[in-house]
Swiss-Prot record:
Organism in which the protein naturally occurs: Leptospira borgpetersenii serovar Hardjo-bovis (strain JB197)
Protein name per the record: UDP-N-acetylglucosamine--N-acetylmuramyl-(pentapeptide) pyrophosphoryl-undecaprenol N-acetylglucosamine transferase
Molecular function as annotated in GO: UDP-N-acetyl-D-glucosamine:N-acetylmuramoyl-L-alanyl-D-glutamyl-meso-2,6-diaminopimelyl-D-alanyl-D-alanine-diphosphoundecaprenol 4-beta-N-acetylglucosaminlytransferase activity; undecaprenyldiphospho-muramoylpentapeptide beta-N-acetylglucosaminyltransferase activity
Entry's EC annotation: 2.4.1.227
Pathway the protein contributes to: Cell wall biogenesis; peptidoglycan biosynthesis
Localization per record: Cell inner membrane
Length: 358
């Protein structure tokens, strides 16, 4: 019985699209000639909500990162790779789908050594180290955004970032369909820093809440990140709407008129699916500055305004919000552009591309 493995470790940005592909493959695996489907992730992700709700069995491994103990690393790394090889041979794994990150290395090496099909998903415009290393061995690769360097040494297509079924909108409402310009009510602003939260963004928005003119025009809902919730709640007013973590992002996207966020691929793809204008403050220390590259792509296409800063000075964001408050048409144009950048069928399209389905 042949099997498919989706290697999705690392952070939520790798896990969520992996689970999204699993949702589609669960329904199609027999049609494409495979009996079993598994997700393969790091043990530390056992409490990840997406993996807890996975539509297929999840297998666990403990591949160490390169930064672990330099003396024990070679031994631990080799042992874990061998364990992966033995497990995959036992399961008769014939296809490996890598979602990016160091945790996929053992799975991809299995595919190379035993000449199995290898498909890679790259979420960012600037591919990560693992993707760059293994593109040449891949049968196909799927990108969420157009790669900054188009010289990719394998067949690839830009298909969007796979999204979970529970996150997809029933209808993508543009800004003009959600905000009544005649009433001129407060703008609903969703603030989020990604799966881990972002202290910088939290502190910038807290400072903004100290400006009365901002509070009159904007209503903030801040997803602080679980680890930062207590810290933020101590700094803000009692009536501030703070949420530590949400497993139902759809309701927040439907509530929002626009978002203030980092520029991870998952967040950007979800916001685009909901036709949301974006104010992006990319994480300044991201590997290869990939968040800035993602953000600039959306800015170039009219869906986002990018703020490039490392400090917590709220004046930059204040100016942008003031610009928005006095130009509602800008938000409407950004909303239309955001929807044009979306790929709501990315999960299905990626599976069809990998397995050559009509």
């Amino acid at each position: 019985m042949r099997s498919i493995v989706i290697a999705a470790g690392g952070t939520g940005g790798h896990i969520s699209p992996g689970v999204a592909l699993a949702e589609v493959l669960t329904d199609l695996k027999e049609k494409i000639g495979y009996e079993n489907l598994y997700l393969y992730s790091l043990i530390r992700n056992q409490n990840n909500p997406d993996l807890e709700q996975a539509p297929c069995p999840v297998l666990w491994h403990n591949l160490p990162p390169l930064s672990s103990n330099i003396f024990l690393f070679p031994f631990r790394y080799t042992i874990q790779i061998l364990k992966t090889f033995l497990l995959f041979k036992k399961l008769n794994v014939d296809v490996v789908i890598g979602m990016g990150g160091y945790s996929t290395v053992s799975s991809i090496l299995y595919g190379i050594l035993f000449k199995k099909k290898i498909y890679l998903c790259e979420q960012n415009t600037v591919p990560g180290n693992v993707s760059r290393l293994f593109f040449r061995f891949a049968n196909k690769a799927a990108f969420s955004f157009p790669p900054k360097n188009s010289a990719i040494p394998c067949d690839y297509q830009v298909l969007g970032n796979p999204l979970r079924k529970k996150t997809l909108p029933k209808m993508s409402l543009k800004f003009s369909e959600k905000y009544d310009t005649k009433k001129k009510t407060q703008f609903n602003v969703l603030v989020m820093g990604g799966s881990q939260g972002a202290r910088q963004i939290n502190n910038i928005v807290i400072a903004l809440m100290g400006h009365e003119e901002i509070n009159i025009q904007f209503r903030f809902r801040v997803l602080t990140g679980s680890a930062l919730y207590e810290e933020v709640s101590k700094k803000t007013k009692k009536d501030a709407e703070l949420i530590s973590y949400s497993d139902n992002m759809k309701e927040h996207y439907e509530w929002a008129n626009f978002v203030i966020a980092r520029a991870g691929s998952g967040v950007l793809s979800e916001c685009a699916a909901f036709a949301l204008p974006m104010i992006l403050i990319p994480y300044p220390y991201a590997k290869d500055d990939h968040q800035m590259a993602n953000a600039r792509y959306l800015e170039l296409n009219g869906a986002a305004i990018v703020i490039d800063q490392k400090d917590e000075d709220e004046s930059h964001l204040f100016k942008v919000l003031d610009q928005i408050a006095n130009n509602v048409n800008l938000l409407n144009d950004m909303s239309i552009s955001s929807l044009q950048c979306s790929h709501v069928d990315a999960s299905k399209d990626t599976v069809k591309y990998f397995f050559s389905l009509d």
